[in-house]
């Protein structure tokens, strides 16, 4: 169990470090119009695009951007969901209000809501982070709300209230240690979901400026050239997106099984 957690934490820290450090080591991606649409070679591992830019360097830069935005979005979403779970269990009225908000947001078309929020916040990384946070919180909040409700009935929370602590503070102090594993796993499972939605947003032309390389944007731009035989334009961005999503999804499932096994024992 401990080894699995160490591996997982190492994976997350590695992604964070890579997303922050890698862009500083990528040389400036200049236009080389004389080398447009070059096929993969030793000079250009994954070829060049219609403006002569190195597809490999752009893909690495796009992946780093997606990981940075995705990690920030997942963290803010998790913190917001945790806050609502604690707040919702502070009183019966707040519980019903949070439940109503969850049901309302889950009833809305997910991608459409994400697009509308992105349009409201603008075209930069912060806009995507806010849009993702305000559209992806319901399911994690739903899980944490029920877990916190069970903890709220425990003796130590009731005793803390009897000794003068507010219910909100009692749940913060005694509840989080018991749901921390579920919270972390929820974030890990949410991360690939967020990455896919960020890619979908940028594929449709929302979110970041066109000058910022993104995996979804590169896939969208490659559409017009794929039918002409320039297959490499969409290969690497697509492979990188699929790989990172599969790795994170597998890590999340593995940790879920470990926690379930540990709880049953």
Task: Enumerate the language-model features and the residues they cover.
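Membrane-cytosol interface at the C-terminal ends of specific transmembrane alpha-helices
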Residues: 74, 123-172, 182-191
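C-terminal transmembrane helix and the adjacent membrane-cytosol boundary/short C-terminal tail
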Residues: 135, 181, 188-189, 230-265
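Short helix-to-coil transition segments within interhelical loops
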Residues: 48-53, 91, 159-178, 219
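Non-cytoplasmic
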Residues: 115, 124, 129, 133, ...
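Transmembrane-helix boundary motif in ABC transporter permease subunits
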Residues: 22-25, 66-103, 114-115
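Transmembrane alpha-helices
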Residues: 64-80, 168-200
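N-terminal signal-anchor/first transmembrane alpha helix
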Residues: 1-30, 179, 242, 246
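Generic hydrophobic transmembrane alpha-helix motif, especially the helices
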Residues: 45, 49, 89, 95-150
């Amino acid at each position: 169990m401990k080894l699995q957690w160490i591996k997982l934490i190492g994976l997350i820290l590695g992604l964070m470090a890579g997303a922050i450090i890698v862009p500083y080591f990528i040389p400036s991606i200049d236009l080389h119009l004389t080398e447009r649409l070059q096929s993969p070679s030793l000079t250009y591992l994954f070829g060049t695009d219609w403006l002569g830019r190195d597809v490999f360097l752009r893909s690495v830069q796009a992946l780093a951007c997606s990981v940075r935005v995705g990690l920030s979005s997942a963290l803010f979403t998790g913190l917001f969901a945790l806050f609502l779970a604690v707040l919702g269990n502070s009183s019966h009225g707040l519980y019903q209000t949070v439940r109503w908000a969850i049901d309302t947001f889950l009833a809305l078309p997910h991608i459409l809501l994400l697009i509308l929020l992105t349009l409201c916040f603008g075209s930069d990384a912060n806009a995507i982070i806010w849009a993702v946070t305000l559209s992806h919180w319901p399911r994690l909040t739903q899980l944490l709300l029920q877990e916190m409700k069970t903890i709220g009935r425990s003796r130590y929370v009731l005793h803390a209230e009897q000794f003068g602590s507010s219910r909100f503070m009692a749940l913060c102090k005694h509840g989080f240690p018991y749901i921390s594993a579920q919270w972390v796993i929820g974030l890990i499972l949410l991360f690939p979901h967020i990455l896919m939605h960020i890619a979908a947003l940028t594929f449709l032309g929302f979110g970041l400026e066109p000058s910022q390389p993104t995996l979804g944007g590169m896939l969208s731009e490659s559409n017009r050239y794929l039918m002409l035989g320039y297959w490499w334009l969409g290969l690497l961005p697509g492979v990188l997106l699929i790989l990172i999503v599969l790795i994170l999804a597998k890590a999340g499932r593995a940790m879920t099984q470990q926690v379930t096994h540990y709880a049953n024992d």
